UniProtKB/Swiss-Prot annotation:
Residues 102-300 form the ATP-grasp domain. The gene is ddl. GO terms for molecular function: ATP binding; D-alanine-D-alanine ligase activity; metal ion binding. ATP binds at residues 128-183. Its main location: cytoplasm. It is an enzyme of class 6 (ligase). Cell wall formation. Its EC number is 6.3.2.4. The lineage of its organism: Bacteria, Pseudomonadati, Pseudomonadota, Alphaproteobacteria, Hyphomicrobiales. NCBIfam families: D_ala_D_alaTIGR (TIGR01205), PRK01372.1 (NF002378). Belongs to the D-alanine--D-alanine ligase family. GO terms for cellular component: cytoplasm. Mg(2+) 2 binds at E267, N269. This is D-alanine--D-alanine ligase.
Amino acid sequence: MKDEHIAVLMGGFSSERSVSLSSGTACADVLEAQGYRVSRVDVDGHIASVLEQLQPDIAFNALHGPFGEDGRIQGVLEYLKIPYTHSGVMASALAMDKGRAKIVVASVGVSIAPSCVMSRFAVGKEHPMEPPYVIKPVCEGSSLGVIIVKENESVPSLNVVGSEWVYADTVIVEKYIPGRELTCAVMGNKALDVCEILPEKHFQFYDYDSKYKSGGSLHVCPAQLSSNIYQNVQRMSLAAHQAIGCRGVSRSDFRFDEETGELVWLEINTQPGMTPTSLFPDIAKASGRTYGDIVQWMVEDASCMR
């Protein structure tokens, strides 16, 4: 039995709760198998008092979505002086805001798609840019709320303004880039292998279901790309990780249009999924690391003041 007591934070109350429970359970299982004393914590509004009672040596952050990866839980852990995994307060908050993250990443020479941040009600009145374009909640993950507006389509007013929209009122609208979906993980200060995502044909893109349903997508890792494009994806992933100030692990998503040669950075994820169908474990495996290796590395990398 190892000496450290690890609290695995999971669940929470974001729309990605089920994903977080899956990630957290898998990580907790591995940590227990490695001999750590593990407390599985389903995060709620009393998390500070729960952690004060548990007095863990390390908090393993397996939360996803608002509160879990936007700087708030990180602030609680800093206040309680509990070392934790993944990025710190500032980087988490910045990465979660897709609009601001794009500005920072573009400032270090990373190619991004033209975009604008606006109210969802304004999008519902007229096209904010010439279609095709993509509408996303500015602070959500797992492709939740993503709408693709194709050429010659009308304004998607019911989807964005209607009562079925359950996300925040601010959205980011960006030019739709056709082509291949690529992603690259960073671990510490090293870019790992590039992975291509091939959603099953009945999925329009790599959405929530294709991410988490068994057989929803195929992960080709390493991706079959020219050495120039492959290295550019790695370079931009590391540049984004460093510009935003990420710590631990991150994963950047890209679109590559083979016809034009355009390679565009889309967004960064500071809390990559660790579910059985997640990308990050597959990327790490291609680099010669087991699931247990990466979980162990995250624990050893944990600290405050990240």
